[in-house]
Regions:
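Active-site SXXK
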Residues: 145, 162-186, 210, 282-286, ...
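Short, charged, amphipathic alpha-helices and their helix-cap/turn boundaries
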Residues: 128, 146-150, 192, 226-267, ...
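N-terminal leader/targeting segments and the immediately adjacent pre-domain N-terminus
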Residues: 22-155, 212, 216, 449-457
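Bacterial N-terminal signal peptides that target proteins for export
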Residues: 1-10
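Active-site Gly/Thr loop motif
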Residues: 309-313, 365-429
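Active-site helix/loop module of the DD-peptidase/beta-lactamase fold
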Residues: 180-223, 262-263, 288-325, 330
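Active-site-proximal alpha-helical segments within enzyme catalytic domains
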Residues: 213, 278-285, 324-348, 416-433
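Bacterial N-terminal signal peptides
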Residues: 9-19
Length: 457
């Protein structure tokens, strides 16, 4: 696969995704958005390491919106590492001493390649990370709890960075914990836990189907929805940011959610369609079951136990609900600590296991291959590009990909990722700020290939 066909900086690429839009009005909105200051790429990701001058920051603040950030241009480099300047946030605090991660570097990983989805061989890991088109900012790979590879071409290690949809893995993990502990019956309708949505199409959605992204509602976050400023996805993100929608109106989150419509002829559980809108509702479910704010529950169950170096910052909607589908922020090393709790090396970061075997088993087995195949998950560009020769069996419990061997992966917008492989005792995490819809993210393939190679050592 030749990435030169996807040169990010070229405005000539815009028609590639404009042609998929549903209406001329949407085309015009995207074209206008691409002309705004900071929407296109002129800066390398290394600019984040150097910092930005006041003129740049002032411009980023003036242009801030959910859609402007989605474009992944120069301003997005500032948003992904300084997001708490724009949306209110709460903090899940660490507790106790920092869990030190030993460095046992394996230089040979820099030369790692893998067979991509089209059967071709990738460039080396180091070459990909150093390629300015990749927009990778930080990568870490750990084996048996030790850091065996790390690189920070586009951020400082101590900087906080947005998780984007990697955050969904946290929501799914917490709900699976609650299910395993008998605190929730996941066969019940999701509106039993979110009364504000009673009387809407959400009444037809069992909690377990929402957890597995098979709601039967027309709320998919496909490529078109991501770039359509009037989609349900962009509307809910705008409501959470507290910024006007495409029609200039600041919407209430529950009003947006109540607008969801059922897909004709499709019942919940039949087709898995990726959706941040679903996870938005699941965060409210966690709060209803526990009687705690989402942030405090994350702190109690996970963040205070992993020896994190920094707080986990979680943005809040104007109504105070945590934006748990994407607006979490931490250092990359703390994300790696979180990834370790799913592996046999959990003891490196915690004095007790946080993810019970039953919880892990449910996430590894509790979904439908038929719903996965029928839905849009296999069509995601990163799935095709990385795993056409090694396909996941399904998505599950908010994880995007689960393999037969039990490995799990969650991808995030603007190209973030978490790979955790319990059988091989390997985790991989990465941050980036890459425009959506312009080129596939190839880092996930390196993570899985590294796990296979390291397990043989």
């Amino acid at each position: 696969m030749n990435l030169s066909a996807f040169r990010f900086a070229s405005i000539a690429l815009v028609p590639l995704f404009l042609s998929t839009m549903a209406t001329a009005q949407t085309n015009e909105a995207v074209e206008a958005a691409m002309k705004a200051p900071g929407a296109q790429i002129t800066l390398p990701v290394s600019a984040v390491r150097k910092g930005f001058n006041k003129e740049f920051v002032d411009s980023a603040r003036k242009q801030f919106s959910n859609f402007h950030m989605q474009l992944g241009g120069d301003h997005a480099l500032y948003y992904t590492t300084h997001f708490t300047e724009f949306v209110p946030a709460a903090m899940a605090l660490p507790s106790g001493p920092v869990s030190e991660l030993k460095r046992l570097p394996k230089p040979e990983l820099a030369d790692l390649t893998y067979t991509m989805g089209d059967g071709s061989t990738s460039k080396t890991l180091q070459a990909h990370i150093n390629d300015p088109d990749s927009r990778v900012q930080g990568v870490m790979i750990l084996h048996k709890g030790n850091v065996v590879y790390e690189a920070f071409p586009g951020m400082r290690p101590e900087q906080l960075h947005i998780w984007a949809s990697v955050a969904k893995s946290m929501v799914g993990t917490l709900l699976t914990m609650l299910e395993s502990e008998g605190r929730v019956d996941t066969s019940r309708p999701i509106t039993d836990f979110v009364p504000e949505l009673k009387g809407s199409e959400w009444d037809t959605v069992p909690l377990i189907d929402a957890m597995n992204m098979a709601s039967g509602l027309d709320i998919s976050e496909d490529a078109e929805a991501t770039m359509n400023p009037r989609s349900m996805f962009q509307r809910i993100v705008g409501a959470d940011f507290g910024v006007p929608n495409a029609d200039g109106v600041v919407e209430d989150e529950m009003d947006v959610l109540r607008d969801a419509k059922q897909i004709e002829g499709e019942d919940a559980g039949e087709v898995a369609r990726y959706s941040s809108v679903i996870t938005k509702v699941l965060v409210a479910v966690v709060e209803d079951i526990t009687g705690q704010t989402y942030t405090s529950y994350v702190e109690d169950r996970i963040w205070s136990h992993i020896g994190a170096r920094s707080p986990l910052v979680i943005n809040l909607s104007p109504q105070g609900l945590a934006v748990g589908y994407g607006l979490l922020h931490s250092t990359l090393e703390d994300l790696a600590r979180y990834a370790l709790i799913f592996t046999p090396s959990w003891h490196v970061v915690s004095d007790k296991p946080l993810v019970a075997p039953e919880v892990l088993r449910k996430m590894q087995t509790g979904s439908s291959a038929e719903a996965y195949t029928a839905g849009d998950f296999p069509d995601h560009s990163w799935v095709r590009a990385n795993f056409g020769q090694d396909m996941p069996i399904f998505n599950s419990h908010q994880w995007d990909a689960v393999w037969e061997d039990g490995a799990l992966f969650k991808h995030g917008n603007l190209y973030q990722g978490i790979y955790t492989d319990p059988a091989r005792d390997v985790v991989g995490v990465f941050f980036a700020t890459s425009p959506v819809n312009l080129a596939p993210d190839l880092v996930p393939g390196y993570m899985r290939e590294a796990a296979k190679k390291l397990a043989k050592q």
